[in-house]
Regions:
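Non-catalytic cap/lid and distal C-terminal segments of serine-dependent acyl enzymes
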Residues: 1-131
Length: 131
């Protein structure tokens, strides 16, 4: 298992984005869990305040964690498009970078508090993206 910290420029958000990724060892199309933090958290919250790395160690599940910047993971009319970033750009980017499975049955989304809202919202609006 590798814990990878990435800083890259998001086209959708028009700003740098920090990502933590837990990637299994080996090769292949990994199942993927997009894990969203709650209000006041950031892309490091799940790593520093939970045992997520222990839970997925020795599995074929990759975990992707981003910062929601307390914006509830929705597109803002007069602001940034976090929902579009989460459900389109992030999936495409991480799938290409890490060799994640393209099959919706292998892609999951979850969160707590604000992240739980973002996860349910994404799963309901884009059911074709998540298994």
């Amino acid at each position: 298992m590798a814990l990878i910290n990435i800083n890259y420029e998001s086209k959708t958000l028009g700003m740098p984005v920090m990502i933590n990724a837990i990637i299994p060892q080996g090769r292949g199309s990994y199942k993927t869990l997009y894990l969203l933090h709650g209000m006041g958290g950031d892309y490091t919250t799940w790593i520093t305040k939970s045992r997520v790395a222990d839970y997925v160690d020795n599995t074929d599940i990759a975990v992707i964690m981003i910062s929601g910047d307390n914006k509830c993971y929705v597109d803002n009319v007069h602001g940034r498009k976090y929902f579009t970033f989460l459900t389109e750009e992030l999936i495409e980017t991480c799938t290409n970078w890490f060799g994640l499975s393209c099959d919706r049955k292998d892609r999951y989304i979850a969160g707590m508090s604000m992240g739980g809202y973002g996860a349910v919202h994404a799963a309901l609006i884009k059911p074709d993206e998540y298994g």
